[in-house]
């Protein structure tokens, strides 16, 4: 909806729920997942990434990412296109001014203070601690960080993510962790033989999936 355009680039747990039932779109999505799990009597512990970032559960792992910043960049950069390499950083600052997740170049890292420095659109330099929900990670280092912080033993993923999982495993080792056992599966295709992809919007809802 057009009314959500101003929420672009906010964390999903800050985006308004378009259905008006929950505090955020993230809470809406989490509720749908938990409803599915509960209907089938799954025994699970629900982990909120937003809560773990804000409550400091990920802090030690984030500091390790910062301490090994250069080595991690050496692993990630060869997998990126030239244009992307120019501004890439594992850390995405969350602007204290707008609350938006920023994909900007990092001007400076301070391993002693545990901070990163970036420029706002106004040109103002902002120094942020990487702790307590001030930043989030790009998805590949985030994957590795969660394995480390949550002591994940086993991870499944589609075969299109094999290179990303292998890269995340390298990052996990760099920060002192042991990657989980990895298992990849074949891709699910739609009626046109195209890969089902949430980024393309041709996926199935949980309701449709259960119906089939």
Annotated model-derived regions:
Residues 68-71, 78-212:
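Alpha-helical recognition segments enriched in aromatics with Gly/Pro capping
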Residues 1-73, 168-169:
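N-terminal Rossmann-like or analogous alpha/beta NTP/dinucleotide-binding catalytic cores
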């Amino acid at each position: 909806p057009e009314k959500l355009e101003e929420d672009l680039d906010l964390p999903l747990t800050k985006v308004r729920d378009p259905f008006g039932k929950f505090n955020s779109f993230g809470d809406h999505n989490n509720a749908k997942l938990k409803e599915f799990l509960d209907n089938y009597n799954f025994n699970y512990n629900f982990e909120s990434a937003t809560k773990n970032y804000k409550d400091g559960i990920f802090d030690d792992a984030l500091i390790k990412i910062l301490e090994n910043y250069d080595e991690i960049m050496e692993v990630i950069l060869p997998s990126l296109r030239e244009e992307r390499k120019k501004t890439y950083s594992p850390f995405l600052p969350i602007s204290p001014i707008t609350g938006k997740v920023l994909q900007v170049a990092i001007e400076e890292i301070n391993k002693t203070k545990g901070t990163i420095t970036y420029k706002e659109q106004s040109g103002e330099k902002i120094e942020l601690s990487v702790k307590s929900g001030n930043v989030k990670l790009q998805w590949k280092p985030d994957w590795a960080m969660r394995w480390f912080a949550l002591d994940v033993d086993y991870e499944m993923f589609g075969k299109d993510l094999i290179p990303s999982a292998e890269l995340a495993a390298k990052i996990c080792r760099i920060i002192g962790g042991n990657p989980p056992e990895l298992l990849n599966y074949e891709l699910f295709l739609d009626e046109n033989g195209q890969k089902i992809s949430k980024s393309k919007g041709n996926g199935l809802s949980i309701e449709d999936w259960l119906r089939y």
